[in-house]
């Protein structure tokens, strides 16, 4: 598909910058499909639990989640993922999937993600208010909760001075990493 064309087009580059800052989420299937382009083997990416009863702590045992490599073109070079606190839901899941690939080539730069990977449940209350909460706790491969976000490998904040000068310090750091 189109991703094959893009990866072929970018094949001469030293690496890839994936900027997911301010991305509120989307489709979990797309997160997996994209991340599958960066691994050559099946990998454990985390665990999920499901509600099993009415009690506060009535959850199933953690069930493993795996990422299978794509059967299409896969990227073999460095990747820098740019994140901030406004990366939620499927974006948070994508960052976790990418961080689970232990090939030494994927680096998260920026700020902690916003979290929210737990398959949200939404309902309307009798008074018309809506409620939304994580229905299935989601953990990384080390059993650390993903709901509160994922810390970057390299933490960088854009200063007000940088913003006023339209200087993107995260992009600059990504270029620095890719040129090493």
Task: Mark where each language-model region is.
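Terminal peptide-recognition signature
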Residues: 18, 38, 79, 98, ...
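Intrinsically disordered, Ser/Thr/Pro/Gly-rich linkers and terminal tails that flank
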Residues: 2-14, 29-33, 141-180
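Gly/Ser/Thr-rich loop/hinge elements
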Residues: 25-78, 121-122, 139, 145-149
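Loop/turn elements at helix/coil->beta-strand transitions in domains of secreted/extracellular proteins
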Residues: 12-16, 41-44, 76-78, 102-107, ...
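Extended C-terminal subregions enriched in glycine
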Residues: 78-100, 105-114
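A mature extracytoplasmic/lumenal domain signature
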Residues: 22-24, 85, 112-113, 135-137
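Short acidic catalytic loops
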Residues: 9-25, 81-82
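C-terminal soluble interaction/assembly domains
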Residues: 110-126, 131-133, 139, 145-156
């Amino acid at each position: 598909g189109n991703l094959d064309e893009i990866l072929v087009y970018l094949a001469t580059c030293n690496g890839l910058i994936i900027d997911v800052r301010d991305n509120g989420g989307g489709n979990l299937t797309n997160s997996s499909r994209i991340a599958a382009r960066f691994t050559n083997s099946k990998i454990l990416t985390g665990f999920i639990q499901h509600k099993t009863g009415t009690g506060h702590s009535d959850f199933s045992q953690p069930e493993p989640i795996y990422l299978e490599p794509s059967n299409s073109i896969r990227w073999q070079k460095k990747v820098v993922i740019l994140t901030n606190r406004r990366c939620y839901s499927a974006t948070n899941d994508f960052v976790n999937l990418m961080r689970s690939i232990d090939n030494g080539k994927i680096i998260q730069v920026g700020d902690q993600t916003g979290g929210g990977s737990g398959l949200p449940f939404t309902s309307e209350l009798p008074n018309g208010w809506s409620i939304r909460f994580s229905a299935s706790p989601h953990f990384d491969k080390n059993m650390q909760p993903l709901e509160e976000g994922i810390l970057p490998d390299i933490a960088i904040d854009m200063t007000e001075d940088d913003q006023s000068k339209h200087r993107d310090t995260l992009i600059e750091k990504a270029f620095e990493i890719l040129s090493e």
